[in-house]
């Protein structure tokens, strides 16, 4: 994978450890994608409820960001929820 700020046209972003996702062919930090989103359709992992994740097919758990100004959460799959949610919260607070 490639780090945040780099192109993700051919190679995926480093996701789990760094908290980056591909948007408009560039890797961005997940909380930046969520903060700048105008609608939930701006990224396939944005959500406002667990049902949104299920409907989009991107998981079944919508994790909110600690920053209350970010109105969208991030979808995760329940089987990895404990590990991923912990990392999601840690990345959102420290970055």
Curated annotation (Swiss-Prot):
PTMs per UniProt: Contains 3 disulfide bonds.
Reported tissue expression: Expressed in flower, stem, shoot, root, leaf, seed, pod and nodule (at protein level).
Domain of life from the UniProt record: Eukaryota
Pfam family, one: Albumin_I_a
Cystine pairs: 4-20, 8-22, 13-27
Position of the signal peptide: none
Cross-link (Cyclopeptide (Gly-Asn)): 1-30
Role played: Probably participates in a plant defense mechanism. Active against Gram-negative bacteria E.coli ATCC 700926 (MIC=1.1 uM), K.pneumoniae ATTC 13883 (MIC=2.7 uM) and P.aeruginosa ATCC 39018 (MIC=4.7 uM). Has hemolytic and cytotoxic activity.
Name recorded for this polypeptide: Cliotide T1
Source lineage: Eukaryota, Viridiplantae, Streptophyta, Embryophyta, Tracheophyta
């Amino acid at each position: 994978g490639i780090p945040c700020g780099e192109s993700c046209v051919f190679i995926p972003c480093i996701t789990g450890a760094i908290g980056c996702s591909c948007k408009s062919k560039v890797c961005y930090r997940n909380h930046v994608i969520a903060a700048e989103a105008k609608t939930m359709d701006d990224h396939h992992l944005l959500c406002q409820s667990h049902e949104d994740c299920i409907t989009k097919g991107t998981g079944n758990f919508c994790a909110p960001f600690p920053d209350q100004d970010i109105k969208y959460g991030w979808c995760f799959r329940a089987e990895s929820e404990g590990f991923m949610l912990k990392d999601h919260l840690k990345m959102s607070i420290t970055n």
